[in-house]
């Protein structure tokens, strides 16, 4: 039976400077079946056998392991090609650690009009998909649908000439994956970006479960209109007006079997100790899961 299990996310560390080992121990101690981390963290800790022993000793598995595809869709060609050359070896490490998913992003803006950027992105995604073929690892690309961002984020985009709207919704992400005929490139579905881009439950139901690779869950303030949601002003699931039980239920019915990470960016949980943050994450999910007819375990 398909399950949606919680994984401890780096944003739940409350700014705490936890080591990789401390993070894994925290996940196990607070009842998370999984923990998110990067290959860089794992490699710094030790070889694959040592990392696997740590995970097993704490009763957790990898949720998401970052760092398999080390270039963006619109990175310079040499950088992109070099990154793809390393995919098989890096994916092999992910599998050796017990993982099967990694993350990435899809550009909200492009440096050229969408009609010109689209075929370039399709070609790049086809190559990314082919590079992952046979590795046992899928990548979830996160679209950014939230309408309002920090000034420094906007500056980062504009400084690179990225001023033309590109992919900003689940519908557009599905459209490009259909054109790619993707097998290994999927979606990181964040409830904030889904809701902030006028996403619908129907769109989720139309999404192949095999394409939903990762989940991020959070909520938005009830007194803030959809089109005014700020990416760095999220609140805990259940505190706002997102239809999260329906969201999870629809995702479950696609056949998705994987992990959901709490990602509450902004001041709401700033300064909360990692252990308290981890516990609060599970506490806020329980009533939502119950309403959706799902189990946390």
PLM regions with names:
Residues 1-100, 115-116, 122, 126, ...:
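N-terminal pre-domain/capping segments
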Residues 12-14, 39-43, 68-71, 106-110, ...:
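Active-site-proximal loop/turn and secondary-structure-junction residues that shape catalytic pockets
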Residues 12-15, 261-276:
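A short, acidic, flexible beta-alpha connecting loop/helix-capping segment that sits on the rim
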Residues 21-22, 34-35, 65, 127-241, ...:
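Acidic/histidine-rich catalytic cores of soluble enzymes
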Residues 37, 64-65, 95-106, 138-143, ...:
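Short beta-strand segments at enzyme active-site cores
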Residues 68-85, 106-120, 150-158, 227-235, ...:
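Surface-exposed, active-site-proximal loop segments in enzymatic domains
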Residues 211-213, 244, 256-262:
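A short pocket-lining beta-strand/turn micro-motif at the edge of beta-sheets
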Residues 239-253:
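A short, acidic, amphipathic alpha-helical segment used as a generic capping/interface helix at domain edges
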